[in-house]
Amino acid sequence: EDSLSDWERVYLPIDPGVVL
């Protein structure tokens, strides 16, 4: 899912399980 902006990728946790 490349819908996230560059800053969003840095802001969100690295673990996808935490984001979803």
From Swiss-Prot:
Function: Essential for photosystem II (PSII) biogenesis; required for assembly of an early intermediate in PSII assembly that includes D2 (psbD) and cytochrome b559.
Keyword Chloroplast in annotation: yes
Record-given protein name: Photosystem II stability/assembly factor HCF136, chloroplastic
Signal sequence residues: none
Protein family per UniProt: Belongs to the Ycf48 family.
Keywords assigned by UniProt, alphabetized: Chloroplast, Photosynthesis, Photosystem II, Plastid, Thylakoid
Localization (cell): Plastid, Chloroplast thylakoid lumen
Gene Ontology CC terms: chloroplast thylakoid lumen; photosystem II
GO biological-process terms attached to the record: photosynthesis
Domains as described in the record: A 7-bladed beta-propeller torus, about 54 by 55 Angstroms, with a depth of about 25 Angstroms and a central pore.
Natural source organism: Spinacia oleracea
TM ranges: none
